[in-house]
Regions:
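A short, exposed loop/beta-hairpin motif centered on an aromatic-Gly-Thr core
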Residues: 2, 39-54
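Short aromatic-glycine-(Arg/Gly/Cys) micro-motifs in beta-strand/loop hairpins
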Residues: 15-43, 61
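Short, charged low-complexity intrinsically disordered segments located at boundaries
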Residues: 37-45, 85-95
């Protein structure tokens, strides 16, 4: 069974590099929040009621982070860049599945 802790472990390195997204533990559960540094305000807030929802929100945040990192927001991604980022996303998903297998053993 996937846990929030396992998801946070898998995404820990990414979260330490991305200063725009944070994971906050609220009284209702985890929430992923995206900061807009130009407007100086939160621009996305996604409540994650399950570990799977947390994983999916972090996959989306990671994709945005990598797209900005690669293009600097100045151009569209090339097909090769899209493919590379998709492979990186798939690797995160695979790591989460491995965490499930480890916890289930």
């Amino acid at each position: 069974m996937l846990t929030n802790e396992a998801v946070l472990t898998v995404f820990a390195d990414y979260l330490s590099r991305d200063t725009d997204f944070e994971v906050i533990l609220t009284s209702r559960g985890y929430t992923v929040m995206g900061w807009d540094k130009y407007r100086e305000d939160w621009n996305t807030v996604e409540y994650c009621p399950t570990p799977e929802a947390l994983r999916d929100a972090l996959l989306d945040a990671y994709t945005s982070f990598r797209e900005m990192e690669v293009t600097d927001g100045e151009r569209d991604l090339t097909a090769a860049e899209k493919s590379k980022i998709k492979s990186e996303r798939d690797a995160f998903t695979e790591q989460c599945e491995k965490e499930v297998a480890i916890c289930s053993s």
